[in-house]
């Protein structure tokens, strides 16, 4: 027995060693083998902040940590955390770059870098959250200088906590000597508050299509500006190969003033604005990108690869610190009528000499002498530039304690100018079937108004209540809106009134409607639901409401201007008809007002000034109801629907929508609790979304993150991100039962090899999720490009369940690239044979010893001579080796595992636990009661 134990110990060590020698195929996907590095000795500088003598300012060296790119057109990223958490300001940039090695570099600000590695391939992204460019350097381009008293805000509650440096290495020949590169930038940071805050205004196209062969194609973007005045002082343009010139203008009273104009084929750094121009509320920021389709044989779309195109204009500005915004976007296609008057200079390409193109060596530009190679086989590289991110997914912030706030029915949400969250709730009052009579008159006046504060302003991070108001004012609160001055606009469906409350004031500044008196004239409302305020004109709009089905517009002091809308008269509602206009949101850069037409299950948008219908957004996923809608800068609408009626299967969830075309970009649900009646939604500029529920009495916070199966761009191939550990499962229950099944599988494999026409390919079979974002999509896959027989081949396949001739088979496989680093098939077979050989040798030895000691009579004591050694191994002899008995003598051993594997029908068997939820999943839902049009 001691000898047997020693043998098993040796086998264990052999298998353990073989496991250590096995190189996981997942290592192919790791960005870099070295997770941490320090600055190379060849690099000058320090990773620590350097204090300025006699000043509280300090400098940070943000550099590559001694890298040696091995491929041309490599993009590498490096993150640096701000050394302090308090608010600070970046006031100067000093580049450290050699034009012979680095093509260009960009410095981003964000809060969540895409990687925690010391540096990484930027094709995996720069940041997980929203990022903005602070600085850009390109060879032969002038440096960016911030004006005196201007700084980028970092740290604190609203600023970026991380810097992410991106360096594009153009020609790898510069690294033939294997030197280490430390390209980067030194930033000077001060804790002193700056009177002017710098920011970036991004104007970009999301839907341009460039037909093949067209000589000139225009991409026009224009947005109405409605924020406080900004002062542009630098600009940067960006397109890919087809861009000829990008021009940006301010349009004021029909007059076009140039902000900046440049060829995107020249170094793409920030260039100074030549003629100072300010942009004020009411101005239009207009951008035109001039493209050519010459040389293309198919249409070109907006996208992130070099074979796609982009139309981006970055305007670096400064504005007064009191109401500064560090990042703004415009993605709206310009009206053709507006661009009829664009200056002709926007249609004239800026010539770029061939010498300049050669000198730039940009990976996206190809001259006639150097055409694109292998375009049919190679995936296009991606570049880190701003494009409408349609891979972002909203997930509940499960660490946010606000979901546990003790509130009543949550009817309204809004964000104040400081991005604090305001919650409008009903305290101990409840809207039910006894609240109103058939004439919409409130029946519970006797209980008095809500005695607690109905408006709570909470910190968006900690959910700490910062202030509260609204005691003894309201009976059944409904909608809440906060204007740019911090005033609260609320509605009360019991009072049939609209209120304007000043920040910090208990007495209303303005009251419209007659208390407890429903009506349909200009001085009455009937259960008004929501208010929206135009940030430019100050005019406000009232959704009225549950019983009037109209939108009313008033001047800032409450004078009636106009109204539109009528009750839906058929099963197919026409534009401008409503069945409970329940929620309003302004789209200020388009001058539009969007309405959640609740019981018609759609969103309608109108020109705010005229009330003319523009468009509707309606999807089957909405179901029968859309409760609330909210617009966020950047062209995104957020909405929530209601519980499905009987016969409808649409789940209760939130939606992220592309405002331009109405497409659904994402859906989201809570991780804690469940949506019951999500009643209102509020979206912040950074993509954070809050949802309030009138039945669950809760508020959820959702934060943007990459989708669970997010696309990770690696080495020119888009793959699904894989976790470090993957379980390789062997389904013994699914194995073929007969030799006939094995023969069928062998024939199928041989047939596949014949079809491959000499190209050896491994099937990649991890689940693939294809994302269609309105631009040419690339299949996201857990596939690594293989080269076999000299021909690179990719197979993009989803996992399928193979069934053949009565055999149920499910193969769950992870691709292992066959290489010298892996374990060969021969070695595996050898390791499997060794223990069998050892056991046979042990049995022979035991047999030999017994024969020597007791003689040949032992063969007849317990078995026939025909059984032989195999009989001993099966445990038929008292002196033989019984494997079951041997293992069963060990502590903790159970035979259940062996018994289960030996069951013939195991692939049809099912544990009791496996089906515990089956009845609940597949049973028909009960018929719900008729919905009550309340809340």
UniProtKB/Swiss-Prot annotation:
Keywords: Copper, Cytoplasmic vesicle, Disulfide bond, Glycoprotein, Lyase, Membrane, Metal-binding, Monooxygenase, Multifunctional enzyme, Oxidoreductase, Repeat, Signal, Transmembrane, Transmembrane helix, Zinc. CDD domains: NHL_PAL_like (cd14958). Residues 362-385, 728-764, 778-812, 896-935 are annotated as: Disordered. Residues 1-390 are annotated as: Peptidylglycine alpha-hydroxylating monooxygenase. Residues 391-712 are annotated as: Peptidyl-alpha-hydroxyglycine alpha-amidating lyase. Cu(2+) B binds at residues 238, 240, 310. GO terms for biological process: peptide metabolic process. It comes from the Eukaryota. GO terms for cellular component: extracellular region; transport vesicle membrane. InterPro entries: 6-blade_b-propeller_TolB-like, Cu2_ascorb_mOase-like_C, Cu2_ascorb_mOase_CS-1, Cu2_ascorb_mOase_CS-2, Cu2_ascorb_mOase_N, Cu2_ascorb_mOase_N_sf, Cu2_monoox_C, NHL_repeat. This is Peptidyl-glycine alpha-amidating monooxygenase A. It comes from Xenopus laevis. The lineage of its organism: Eukaryota, Metazoa, Chordata, Craniata, Vertebrata. The gene is pam-a.
